[in-house]
Amino acid sequence: MLHLAILMFCVFSITTGEFVVAGILPEVASDLGVSVGSAGLLVTAYAAGMIVGGPVLTALTTGIDRKRLMQALLAVAIAGNAVSALAPGFSPLLAARVVTALVTSTFFAQAIVLTVRSAPPERAATMVARLAFGMNLAMILGAPIGTQIGGQWGWRATFAAIAGACLLGLGLVSWRLTSPGRDGRSSAVSELRVLGRAPVLMALAITAVGNVGVLMVFSYLAPLLTELGGHPSARLPILLLTYGLGATFGNLIGGVLYDRNPRLFQPALLGLLAAALVAGWSVATSSALTVVAVAVLGFFGFAILPGMQARVMATAAEAPTLAMAVNASGYQVAAACAGLFGGLIADSSAGPRPLYLVAAALTACGLVLTVLATRASRAPDSEEAVATAN
């Protein structure tokens, strides 16, 4: 369990750097003499770095010992955040953020594979959920603390603190993490071939389609809660914390449920998420009920993730690391599409309320794909057969 705690802390440290930027954008913009909109490119560039760079870097580092690779990735994260803290202008800061983004999904993919392979196959989703708890903590603790540090000592202190946390993570990995060697990994070309299989492509599609709806609502929670729900802007941090707490419990419980019966619970969780989105639409103008809706959406929005990640790993058993990196990119693509198309809906004459129904419909599409994939997995080339063969 110690190695899991170490990896969880490393994930917490790295992903805090991803989530915290939104909270310090005004300070960055003011200090570097750019508009808040221009400073927002830090978020866009980071996402682009994860989408493109994560899979490429993972493919290029296929043959490297996992422990040494994770040490190198943490070193890059330390350097990227340190350069961010010392950046003399916006362009160097933007470049440093892109470099840091390159290692985020690669490290998470390595950590997931290492964690899952240290546990019995029937506990794969549970282990993924426990590791992802570090990401949940980054959302509900790391980002607020980093924002507070930025408000107290300046945004540069925020990046310096993240660099320090990554440095501590590097020390812990070097001290206690056991190197598994190459653990039977194949070449990059062989792993790319694995990603072309129909079950793998279906699993990746489920991640993208199944998440875009809830991400659309999350991206526009502020107008949904203030314009429709009647909440004052000052209450938004508390409501976001409510979402984060729901997400934390959903992530942990979703992993346990998937391991107990993936054929039953993964479709059920997606169906309940779609129903929760419809319920969110129906109570959108009630201040009290929207608080409950936010917590429920956070719960089911994250309860579906461990099972999705476990399915990707099972269908791509010969290339789990690259598959997880591509899966993370798929999630980021879903987030980008959610922001883009959600904005079009929110700016329409109907206002933001239809976001709930559009999100429910998209989630239902993810449910359909999951049911189809579950039925197909009963064939001899199913994900279970692949997992058993390995």
What are these regions (language model features)?
Residues 54-66, 250-262, 346-347:
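Helix-to-loop junctions at the C-terminal end of transmembrane segments
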Residues 315-350, 359:
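A late C-terminal transmembrane helix in Major Facilitator Superfamily
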Residues 264-308:
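C-terminal transmembrane helical hairpin of 12-TM major facilitator-type secondary transporters
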Residues 33, 65, 86-92, 283-285:
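Helix-breaking motifs and short loop linkers at transmembrane-helix boundaries and internal kinks
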